Amino acid sequence: MAHYSKVDLDEEFERFMKELSDDSFENSNETPSQPNKDRKKKDTAPWWIAEDGFEDDGLLGTNVSYLKTKKTYQPITDMEEENEKVQFLKSSGTSVLSVDSLEANELVASELHHSTLGLGLDTLEEQEEKEQFFARLEKGLTSSIDYSKLNQELDSDDSAQFRVLHRYQGNVEPAEGGRENESEHKELPETYSDDFEDAEDTDEPLITKDEETRPKENPESGKGSFPNQEEEKTGMLANVVLLDSFDSVEDVDLNNHERPTPKAKALPEMAGGELAETGVSYGQSSGDTEALHQAYHHVAHSLGDTGEPRIEASPGHSVRSSAKDGLQENEESSKNISTTESDLPTVEELMKPIRIDSYGIRGFDLQPVSLQKAVGSKEAESVSSLPLTVNTNTMSQDTRHVSPFPHEQDESVVLHRTAGEGVGSSCPATEEHLDKMYLEILRKKTSVNPSLLPQDNKANQTSRSRLSAREEAPVTSKQVPCKKARSAPPLPRRKPQSGLYASARSSGYSKPSSPLQFFSALEKKTSKDNTKTKNVRPIPTSNQFRKREILSGTKLIKPAALNKPSPHREGSPATPKRPEDPSDDSFVQLQTETLGSYGGNREKELLMLKRAQDAEEKWRGAQALIEQIKMTFSEKEKELENTVESLKRQQERELFKLNQENYILQAKLSSFEETSRKQRWLQFGETSDPLTEEKLKQIQKEIQEQETLLQGYQQENERLYSQVKDLQEQNKKNEERMFKENQNLFSELASLKEQMHKNHFLPQAVENIEPTKNQSFTDLLAELRAAQKEKNHLMEDIKRLKQDKQALEVDLERVKRERDQAKDQIAYTTGEKLYEIKILEETHKQEVSRLQKRLQWYAENQELLDKDAARLREANEETERLKLEIEKLKTESGSPANQQRLRSKERALDAKRIQDLERQVKEMEGILKRRYPNSLPALILAASAAGDSVDRNTVDFMERRIKKLEADLEGKDEEAKKSLRTMEQQFQKMKIQYEQRLEEQEQMLAHRQREAPQNQHNSSSRLKALETELGGIKEAHQITVRKLEAEIDVLKHQNAHLEHKKNDKEDQDLQSIEFQVEQAQARAKLARLNEELAAKGREIQDLTKTVERLQKERRMMLSRQSPRGREEMAAKRLKKEILHPNSGNANAFSETLGAKLYHPHTFTDSHISEVLEENYRLRSELEGLTLEREKLKMESEAAVCQLESSMKRVKDDAAAHIASLKAAHEREIEKLLCQNAVENSSSRVAELNRKIATQEVLLKHFQGQVNELQGKQESLSLSQVREEILQKQITKLLEELKEAKENHTPEMKHFMGLERKIKQMEMRHKQREQELQQIIQQTRQVVETEQNKEVEKWKRLAQLKNRELDKFRTELDSILDVLRELHRQGVVVPVALADEESTAKEF
């Protein structure tokens, strides 16, 4: 919907005040219509978008017309029926739209012409249209209704009644109704929306004015049936507050509210001298007086029946009662009583200060952020700052209607109850009964859901304070509203209503009421009001505040149309009370008297006019205060904006907490439901809960809808993306086409220039042409002149361009100079930076090398530690294993005495056996020597056996010894490395500590140097203190030195004693070591002897076997062969015996001697030639054997010599190793002594001496390293010089090679050029690829951001809709709770209510 800017609103407000002061009533009819025309042109948006029209600047727009509006008087009986019907429909979530309510200007003749007009076609058509409309509602076809067409049709239907009313009024304002009708139609382009989601804006923290006017209608319609409660009990249900979230369209002006409500319009009264219309001036024109006369005639006729229901049904009661209640509540408002006949605020009312006590309930204007959206800072200001003086009775209904939380309903119930006490006789006992019922229901709800009551305590406190104020009010003030209710006149002219369902017309048929009772009540009222409003002093408020009150005056006055007073709410806008001036009171009295006598007294009329002039002067005086109000407006506005922002943030935080708690509770509830469902299945085997199934179906349905929405968004995004691509392609094509066209145009331009050039310098052969061609000649001359002008222009351009060129050259030179300067500066800075970078690089390299060395050192240290740990682990394992073996041996063997006995016996047996074996060996050797004294194999065998055994045993022993010594040496080396490593660690630690100490000392020195000039003035006193302190320190130092010396002496004695003990231990250790060595040698000798014994036994067994075998062979040979054979066998045997000298032992010898067999052919004679051959053969064999023996002897001698040399070498090595081990052992002992001394001495002197010794050692080591490094540095410098020379030579050779290649052939040059071009092309290609990649990434990012924004927008929309659904469900739950409570208390519910409850449950 189109919006008015602030400037337009200010202009309209100025016009309105001008009209009030200048009596320009006719001109005022034209002014509001102009913006409406503009709005009608602008308002092309559909009805569902137009509902949120008031959200931009926070103001209510200018839909409020300041023209006179026509009013209709409706009978009460039809109102009650209509109210009940529409209220029940609204509570079920159905939007109720009557054909009557859709009209913008519904003008029906008043009760004066009720008899003349009769029932009329209009009423019958209304009934038919209502029936059709409700039938469509039941069928669910309300969304297809075109309400704008219905408005036009109904306006055309009502034109007849317009004419009737105008005729009856004497054509006082003929053009006014038409203008208003026109303006009203322009102001009401909106139609009702079925979608409650569009109607509610859940992020508004403050309730707007129009939002307040809507809820006020429902309770008042419900209270319209109170006069009939004694006869009908069903009228009580009108008190049930049913918040119709479908109709809660925010920021829509009053006429839009009037449309969807089918109730009769309540008529605010007009009494006294005040005019009912918003644009009427207070001048004394004849048209105004005639209109007043007609109004009082209507009053006289409409109040003919003055029964109690009639009085309560009159609209005057509501505003009067609201004024009286406002007097009882606020001390300041007691001076300003609003007259029931006018919606305009008085000057006193506009000047009222914004105070806390002028409001009703605190905290009610602060709605949570998630529920309603702030319309704007200005409207929030006006909403939170308006002084409200409307009755709390209807305020309680309004709060119940607006509030989405139970605590607000609790507030409203308490207020409703207090209001009921203030009303007095107009409030029957049934209302108190309903109040108690509401209190019980709301207590239960607040006890069940305490998380939804962040403002409960505050509201209850304020409501209790208001209740106590009500109870303390005097009884006379309570009775005033009932008296005033009898003097409520309906007016013939219609103006925007603030009562409940004020826009709906009813087709009732009530009788005109008598005017007599009205006059008596009116006189009483005016006489009382005169006494109360004499000493009213205007107080300045903000201009914006008063402007909003006047602009929204027709919308915000809610005098209860049906027996109910207007609501009084803190923070929500309502019509402020308007105090009556004495002139107004006298004007009322005068008017009533003139109406009583009707044309009787002329003087009263003159007095009335005089008082009207006085009122006009007061209004002009009030206009002067507007300037003062403007000054304070900006400050108030800023303060209110700040407060609104802080409240918004507070509400956002509270809402966030509530959402979190709600989410947790929902999760808990779902878990509880699942457990209860499982228990039910286990116990009864029932199926799942149908309610949860329905909820699941609803949730699935919502999820499907969301998915379809997302699919639609995705399709739309794809379509838009394809469109973007098409547009990009089209753009490229257009660029190519334009480029081609430009080229064509350039070519055409060149050709035209050439043609023009030719035309300029054509030969002057044209002179010889015939005179008929004079016209063409003149044309050519004109072209020539034009060309010359063009030429002149071009020459000027050339001059100008030359000048520009010179200027640009000057600038270019300047830029070049600047460039050269910048280059020089850059070179200078780069040189400095390069030098700094080099220094930093060198320092970095040094640091890196230092850290690498330290890292390497740590790595080596870790390796050593790992080795030590492995060795320690192995040693532990070995010790464990040995312990187990020892335990096993102990268990196997008995006591140590038995073991020693057994060992001694075994040793004795072994010794005897060894002696026996040695004796046998000696005997065998002696036998062999005796038998074969010169036998070479026996000698060699004896020598080899003896030598081998000795040699092998000694070699094994030496090898084992060498291995052991090597292992000890490696262990010593590792220990030495460890000690060196520990020394290095200590050195590094000391170095770090020394550096830290130096830094600390330097810092302290610098600090003291900085503090020195400051402390010079008190140096003398400090010096004395320091001297005394120094003396004390010296004494303490001497004492400590003495103590340390004593400790050193004691430690020296302890050290000597320990050294003595250490030496004793070392001697014992050395003796034990020698004993262990001797034991090891004895064991080795024993093992060697055992081995030799075993070898001798094996050799004896072999010899016995060979002897037996030879004997067998001999027997075989002797038995078979002849004497020749025997000789050969003897020779063979001799040979064998020579080869095996050991084969003859004692057993074999005894066998050869004693066991000879007899052979007869043994000693027979043989041939001499055979004997000679045998001798020759034996001699030759003997010579060979002798040669072989000599050879073996030489070899054995060489082996003996070699063995001796190796033994000497092994002995020398062993002696050297033993010497080194002794030296290492001594060093280790010294080290142990040093460690012991360090550990056992706590003296600082010994520690420092040790450190000094270590430092000296390290210094020597480092000096050696420095000397080595100096020598290496010299060689390094020489190598660097050599390397530089070689590098120069290499570069020179490469350049020569390159030049030779280039100058070699042209193909090579071409090849080199191609290589350069290829490199350039590759570089360009890479750059283009990078640019393309950047462009692609940018486009992707843009598309992704747009998609993300779109998705976030739709997500927010979905969240808003879900919150609105939750709100609506909570409202329905509260409504159903109220209805259930009514059922429980026995209230009879009609059929429509039951239908409504069933529909709500289905929802």
Curated annotation (Swiss-Prot):
A GO-annotated cellular component: centriole
Compositionally biased intervals (Polar residues): 26-35, 449-466, 504-517
Family recorded in the similarity comment: Belongs to the CEP162 family.
Residues carrying Phosphoserine: S156, S159, S468
Species per Swiss-Prot/TrEMBL record: Rattus norvegicus (Rat)
Lineage, top ranks: Eukaryota, Metazoa, Chordata, Craniata, Vertebrata
Gene behind this protein: Cep162
Function: Required to promote assembly of the transition zone in primary cilia. Acts by specifically recognizing and binding the axonemal microtubule. Localizes to the distal ends of centrioles before ciliogenesis and directly binds to axonemal microtubule, thereby promoting and restricting transition zone formation specifically at the cilia base. Required to mediate CEP290 association with microtubules.
Protein name: Centrosomal protein of 162 kDa
Subcellular location(s) of the protein: Cytoplasm, Cytoskeleton, Microtubule organizing center, Centrosome, Centriole; Cytoplasm, Cytoskeleton, Spindle; Nucleus
Biased composition annotated in UniProt, kind: Basic residues: 481-496
Biased composition (Acidic residues): 192-204
Positions of the UniProt region annotated as Disordered: 19-44, 171-235, 305-342, 449-586
